[in-house]
Amino acid sequence: MKFRITIERKPGLADPEGKATIRSLHDLGYADVQHVSFGKAIVVDIDSTDEAAALDEVDAMCQRLLANPVMESYRIERIG
């Protein structure tokens, strides 16, 4: 069973990489760009036939290692 974890910075927190990128995009002539934010996507393949248990396991991975709960939010979706 495959799951995609999308991790993003929580709203209201500074995103220096996003700010630097938006400045560069403006310098390149993309003046209409209003917001850029960076995150990450992780795909995890779990050898399980129990979807609920696999989802719980992926959620635990996020809480313990993959995401920083102070600065980031995450969502998990089954993709296969």
Feature-to-residue mapping (PLM):
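Short amphipathic alpha-helix segments
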Residues: 12-28
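Amphipathic, hydrophobic secondary-structure cores in small proteins
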Residues: 31-40
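Positively charged, small/polar-rich N-terminal and surface patches that mediate targeting and assembly
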Residues: 2-4, 27, 71
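Residue-level signal for pocket-adjacent positions within structured domains
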Residues: 8, 28-31, 61, 66
